[in-house]
């Protein structure tokens, strides 16, 4: 009987391992990402084990089947911060990171801030990793993920990253890339984040695809003091190509996305709902092709006062794209001021194979994020 039970257990484990893997294939600029490939799946059970698997030099398929709570793993830090947006209960406060309060908000009242230290810096993710969640069980709480300094070939799929010092600006980012290549982030839910849900830093992030993710901006704290998160998607690289598609951006109020500094963004088939501020902020060096996107109850789709980049976008189908990318571009719905005719954007993307956009719809609201593979 014991022998039979052992065989049954071994068979169950083998079936579980065989069933685990990346679902689907990446699209867009990171279409050749393979992550950990066919490495034998590993199942971390502690936060230390998860950190070790993500940061080592082995190709790995890492499966999350529980919540990994980093909230209290490094204790708390108490220091002086500031209150740039007021001290009402729904307003974020700011940590004085790198003298930010001192240099950028010198007139803001100072205040004491106490935050969870672990959230400040994300977990290092090394090259050739697939990080996959089982069902809706794979959650990283209290700390984000960080892909920097030349790492490449990473897939993150079907997990949630949540609760990173949401009271405090500079409390931590959910997903950070800075000098990373071939990164596919798919069906990830991010919620209650202190700073950015996604940030691509000033070094080049050459080929990145951010697809089918749920950016949940609903929070008890925000820089706009209205329960809508302001810091969402910040694309700031020196030579970046980013595919952003199928994502659901809910209850945001700014930087959704902010694009600048030689970043090429193909942003299509996303759905913005209940944005109390602006969605797009396009600065100098931001090159954006926006098509097939749907906007519902968005106060300002494009921040026109600070616009310094290049944009091709329309609320009607455009055949101009045909001679550059081999097909017509697809109309946005309720795009407001998100209209641009820059053929510079199209010309610079003409050498790339761009995915085709579908008609704009609200389907990301039910299809994006963890648990919707």
From Swiss-Prot:
Q: Which residues are glycosylated?
A: 128, 274, 348
Q: Where in the cell is it found?
A: Secreted
Q: Give EC number(s), comma-separated.
A: 4.2.2.10
State the Gene Ontology BP annotations: cell wall organization; polysaccharide catabolic process
Q: Name one GO cellular component term.
A: extracellular region
Residues annotated as region Disordered? 354-373
From which domain of life does this come? Eukaryota
Signal peptide position in this chain? 1-19
Keyword Nucleotidyltransferase carried by entry: no
Q: What does the UniProt PTM comment say about this protein?
A: May be O-glycosylated; does not contain N-acetylglucosamine.
| Cysteines engaged in disulfide bonds, as pairs | 82-101, 91-225, 321-329
What SUPFAM superfamilies does the record tag this protein with? Pectin lyase-like
The active-site annotation reads: 255
Q: Which reaction does it catalyse?
A: Eliminative cleavage of (1->4)-alpha-D-galacturonan methyl ester to give oligosaccharides with 4-deoxy-6-O-methyl-alpha-D-galact-4-enuronosyl groups at their non-reducing ends
Alphabetized, the UniProt keywords read:
Carbohydrate metabolism, Cell wall biogenesis/degradation, Disulfide bond, Glycoprotein, Lyase, Polysaccharide degradation, Secreted, Signal
Q: Which family does it belong to?
A: Belongs to the polysaccharide lyase 1 family.
Function of the molecule = Pectinolytic enzymes consist of four classes of enzymes: pectin lyase, polygalacturonase, pectin methylesterase and rhamnogalacturonase. Among pectinolytic enzymes, pectin lyase is the most important in depolymerization of pectin, since it cleaves internal glycosidic bonds of highly methylated pectins.
UniProt protein name: Pectin lyase D
Which species is the source of this protein? Aspergillus niger
Chain's gene name: pelD
């Amino acid at each position: 009987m014991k022998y039979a039970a052992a065989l049954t257990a071994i068979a169950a484990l083998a079936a579980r391992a065989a069933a685990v893997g990346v679902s689907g294939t990446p699209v867009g600029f990171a279409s050749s990402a393979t992550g950990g490939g066919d490495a034998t799946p590993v199942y971390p059970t502690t936060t230390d084990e998860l950190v070790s698997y993500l940061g080592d030099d082995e190709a790995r398929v890492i499966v999350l089947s529980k919540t990994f709570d980093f909230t209290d793993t490094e204790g708390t830090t108490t220091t002086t911060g500031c209150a740039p947006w007021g001290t009402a209960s729904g307003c974020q406060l700011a940590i004085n990171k790198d003298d930010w309060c001192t240099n950028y908000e010198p007139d803001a009242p100072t205040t004491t801030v106490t935050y969870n230290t672990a959230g400040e810096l994300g977990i290092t993710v090394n090259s050739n990793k697939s990080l996959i969640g089982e069902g809706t069980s794979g959650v990283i709480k209290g700390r984000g993920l960080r892909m920097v300094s030349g790492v490449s070939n990473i897939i993150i799929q079907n997990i949630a990253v949540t609760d990173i010092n949401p009271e405090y600006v500079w409390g931590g980012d959910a997903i950070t890339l800075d000098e990373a290549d071939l990164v596919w982030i798919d069906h990830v839910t991010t919620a209650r984040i202190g700073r950015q849900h996604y940030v691509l830093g000033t070094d080049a992030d050459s080929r990145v695809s951010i697809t089918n993710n749920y950016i949940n901006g609903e929070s008890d704290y925000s820089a706009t003091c209205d329960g809508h998160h302001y810091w969402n998607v910040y694309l700031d690289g020196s030579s970046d190509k980013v595919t952003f598609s199928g994502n659901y951006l809910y209850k945001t109020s700014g930087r959704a996305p902010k694009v600048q500094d030689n970043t090429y963004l193909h942003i299509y088939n996303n759905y913005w709902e209940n944005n109390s501020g602006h969605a797009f902020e396009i600065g100098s060096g931001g090159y954006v092709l926006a098509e097939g996107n749907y906007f519902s109850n968005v106060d300002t789709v494009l921040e026109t006062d600070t616009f310094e980049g290049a944009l091709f976008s329309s609320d009607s189908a455009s055949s101009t794209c045909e001679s550059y990318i081999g097909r017509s571009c697809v109309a946005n719905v309720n795009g407001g001021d998100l209209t641009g005719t820059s053929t510079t954007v199209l010309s610079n993307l003409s050498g790339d194979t761009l995915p085709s956009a579908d008609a704009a719809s609200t389907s990301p609201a039910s299809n994006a994020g963890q648990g919707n593979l």
